[in-house]
């Protein structure tokens, strides 16, 4: 099997396609959460702690000189990113927890016993015939 055909067989497998879809949806979800945190959560939080905008929090290590830009430790963006991560992690936790509950409910549902095989049916018939013969 050639390299190209092996790659094609690998690429069209369900797991690879599912993973690609998951990555794309995850990236879109990340943008939604970043917007939610930056535009909805952080402004009121900044108001509560005295009007601080987290994205602007920084420590200047070295002032700008001539053409050289300032060296800045932008810890506000880091705080923003940590909050994004925590919200995404919490959302994933809730989703996984819901899936696990659904799986538990499926596992708890009693399943019907499997239908007897043809061999089992024949053995039961033989057993029943032997019982009736022994009684007469």
Swiss-Prot record:
Transmembrane segments: 9-29, 78-98
Membrane topology: Multi-pass membrane protein
GO cellular component terms, semicolon-separated: plasma membrane
Entries under InterPro entries matching the protein: Mechanosensitive_channel_CS, MS_channel, MSC/AndL, MscL_channel
A Gene Ontology molecular function term of the record: mechanosensitive monoatomic ion channel activity
Pfam families: MscL
Main localization, broad class: membrane
Gene3D superfamilies: Large-conductance mechanosensitive channel, MscL, domain 1
Location in or out of the cell: Cell inner membrane
Self-association state and partner proteins as the record states: Homopentamer.
Function: Channel that opens in response to stretch forces in the membrane lipid bilayer. May participate in the regulation of osmotic pressure changes within the cell.
Stated name of the protein: Large-conductance mechanosensitive channel
Lineage: Bacteria, Pseudomonadati, Pseudomonadota, Gammaproteobacteria, Pseudomonadales
Gene (UniProt): mscL
């Amino acid at each position: 099997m050639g390299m190209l055909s092996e790659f094609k067989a690998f690429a069209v497998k369900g797991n690879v396609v599912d993973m690609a879809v998951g990555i794309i949806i995850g990236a879109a979800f990340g943008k939604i959460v970043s917007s939610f945190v930056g535009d909805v959560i952080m402004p009121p939080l900044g108001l509560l702690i005295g009007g601080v905008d987290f994205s602007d929090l920084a420590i200047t290590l070295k002032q700008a000189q001539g053409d050289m830009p300032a060296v800045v430790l932008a810890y506000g963006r880091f705080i923003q990113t940590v909050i994004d991560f925590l919200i995404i992690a919490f959302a994933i936790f809730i989703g996984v927890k819901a899936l696990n509950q659904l799986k538990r409910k499926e596992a708890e549902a009693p399943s019907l016993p499997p239908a007897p095989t043809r061999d089992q049916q024949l053995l039961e018939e033989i057993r029943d015939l032997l019982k009736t013969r022994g009684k007469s």
